[in-house]
């Protein structure tokens, strides 16, 4: 949700331009305000306000601040309205300590009440403000900054990533985390910390991943990590294989359209995980049940996985929303494989569920971000190879997740024919994208709509759900996905003249029944947009608009290809409406609070 960065330079150069550059690359996490704190001339300097990054920068000139070290923050309001007063960094009473924080302090009201009785005066409505006040309290008791932070995290409850600076201990940043992401970067010019790697890729690709409760100290000479017993921890340094350019638009108008166009590459790269997946399957040959746990788009990928695994391998498979997992946890056993799917690997609900599942079952993470919490806590990992995804609405990470699931299902069931079909998917995606101008033109005709319905059967049902989600996320148009066979059980009552209905109808076993459903909505006045085979003349005669997909795309792999035009429809309607598809209102890329 919120994003934090920190930097200390080896030389006495101004750090503010770097902090501003880094924090700007975390805006995809969702934000309503931005702030920076630096240290110079024996004082902490702070600039912050609510609003878009470019607007606040124009007003405050955020790059023009003295000092060679500092911290920065983009805030996504959870406690207190979006305002200058509630934006980070927050300080103690005499502004000797500044703190940025991502997460939620669950017991902040209790702490605030106690500190108020001790004479502390609070200025904001946030939970975060108790942190600098606690640090001040412990530093007044003669603890240094590191140990004051340690004492503070012994008091606070919840999920957090925290970075703090003190004017009484210059040239030092102290950070810690619990159940919120935090990485540390080692660069040629300095040392960095951030909520996510795209923020610091330009400056550091050698990364340290602090564990829960560890204290990280950054100074001009390097990085030191202490465990909860104050012992120095020798951390392994990983190198991120993403390049800074991967996190840039590279000439596209938006990240989302860039990432849609990168999907064939994402599939090709993820196919390289085949041998790793085979090793995992060889090691879990005694499983009797599979349970997917996911949220949002990853949940739809999981539903496709259920269809594949049950139909091909005959293994009973459940799909559970991560936020609802606790109600099913007592059904797990040592013959259950629990698969956690997450783009970020930091989704709070999934991490809570993973900790529970690890106690009884085998666990597997399918994750895009290397070194994320799920990759470190799951027993097995499949690394999708989509590269950094900046747009809030998932596109290329969805097809990369699907690719991993398809490989898993094909190898688990020893289905050689499916493996051959998966290899064709990148070319099918590239071919579909060749019709991008046609899709753009007719998508604009649908921006009048207040409601959309998406219909699919079998493997195409999760695709319908995902298409509807993409529409809702970025166009702000109400969209619902349904199993086409459920039309008569309620949704048909909502069909009126001119309502757009998207029908996903690849050739295969479900074709005839889906065509009957298409005719049902058409006869009631719906404006039918069908996605089907290029050689389907009957479909072209019955639908109002048809997006033609290569006839060689078989029904079983249709989810990997047919989703592409649905993403494009949502994108182009959004652009026509004048919205920013990369930063939809009220949404964040990485949901790190429950």
Q: Model segments located where?
A:
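Acidic/histidine-rich
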Residues: 156-190, 447-473, 508-510, 515
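Catalytic-loop motifs flanking and including active-site residues across diverse enzymes
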Residues: 127-130, 301, 305, 400-407, ...
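Generic C-terminus detector
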Residues: 527-529, 552-594
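Extended hydrophobic-aromatic, low-complexity segments
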Residues: 185, 301-302, 319, 348-351, ...
């Amino acid at each position: 949700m919120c994003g934090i960065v920190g930097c200390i330079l080896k030389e006495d150069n101004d750090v503010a331009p770097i902090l501003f550059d880094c924090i700007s690359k975390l805006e995809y996490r969702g934000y309503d305000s931005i702030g920076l704190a630096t240290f110079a001339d024996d004082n902490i300097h702070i600039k912050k306000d609510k609003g878009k990054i470019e607007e606040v920068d124009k007003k405050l000139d955020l790059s023009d601040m003295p000092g060679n070290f500092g911290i920065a923050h983009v805030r996504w309001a959870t406690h207190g309205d979006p305002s200058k007063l509630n934006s980070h960094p927050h300080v103690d009473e005499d502004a000797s300590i500044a703190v940025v924080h991502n997460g939620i302090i669950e017991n902040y009201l209790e702490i605030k009440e106690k500190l108020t009785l001790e004479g502390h005066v609070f200025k904001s409505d946030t939970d975060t403000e108790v942190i600098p006040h606690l640090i001040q309290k412990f530093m007044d008791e003669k603890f240094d900054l590191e140990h004051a932070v340690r004492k503070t995290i012994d008091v606070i409850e919840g999920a957090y990533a925290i970075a703090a600076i003190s004017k009484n201990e210059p040239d030092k940043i102290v950070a810690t985390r619990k159940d919120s992401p935090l990485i540390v970067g080692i660069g040629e010019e300095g040392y960095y910390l951030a909520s996510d790697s795209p923020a610091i890729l330009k400056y550091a690709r050698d990364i340290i991943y602090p564990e829960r409760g560890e204290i990280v100290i950054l100074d001009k000479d390097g990085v030191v990590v202490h465990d909860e017993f104050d012992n120095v921890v020798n951390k392994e340094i990983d190198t991120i294989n993403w390049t800074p350019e991967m996190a840039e638009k590279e000439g596209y108008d938006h990240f989302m359209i860039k990432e849609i166009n990168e999907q064939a590459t994402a599939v090709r790269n993820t196919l390289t995980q085949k041998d790793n997946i085979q090793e995992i399957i060889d090691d879990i040959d005694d499983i009797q049940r599979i349970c997917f746990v996911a949220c949002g788009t990853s949940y739809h990928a999981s539903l496709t996985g259920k269809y594949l695994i049950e139909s091909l391998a005959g293994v009973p498979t459940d799909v559970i929303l991560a936020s609802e997992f606790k109600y099913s946890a007592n059904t797990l056993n040592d013959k259950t494989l629990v698969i956690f799917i997450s783009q970020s690997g930091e989704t709070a609900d999934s991490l809570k569920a993973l900790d529970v599942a690890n106690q009884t079952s085998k666990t597997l993470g399918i994750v895009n971000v290397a070194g994320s919490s799920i990759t470190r806590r799951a027993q097995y990992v499949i690394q999708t190879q989509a590269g950094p995804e900046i747009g809030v609405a998932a596109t290329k990470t969805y097809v990369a997740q699907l690719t991993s699931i398809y490989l898993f299902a094909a190898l688990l069931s020893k289905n050689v024919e499916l493996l051959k079909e998966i290899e064709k998917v990148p070319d099918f995606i590239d071919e579909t994208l060749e019709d991008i101008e046609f899709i753009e033109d007719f998508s604009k005709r649908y921006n009048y709509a207040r409601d959309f319905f998406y219909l699919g059967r079998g493997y195409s049902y999760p695709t319908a759900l995902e298409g509807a989600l993409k529409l809702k996320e970025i166009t702000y148009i109400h969209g619902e996905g349904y199993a086409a066979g459920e039309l008569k059980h309620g949704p048909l009552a909502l069909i009126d003249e001119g309502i757009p209905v998207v029908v996903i109808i690849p050739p295969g076993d479900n074709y005839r029944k889906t065509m009957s459903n298409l005719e049902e909505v058409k006869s009631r006045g719906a404006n039918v947009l069908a996605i089907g085979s290029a050689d389907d003349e009957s479909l072209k005669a019955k639908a109002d608009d048809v997006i033609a997909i290569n006839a060689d795309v078989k029904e079983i792999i249709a989810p990997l290809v047919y989703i592409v035009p649905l993403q494009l429809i949502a994108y182009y309607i959004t652009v026509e409406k004048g919205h920013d598809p990369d930063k939809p209102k009220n949404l964040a890329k990485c949901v790190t609070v429950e």
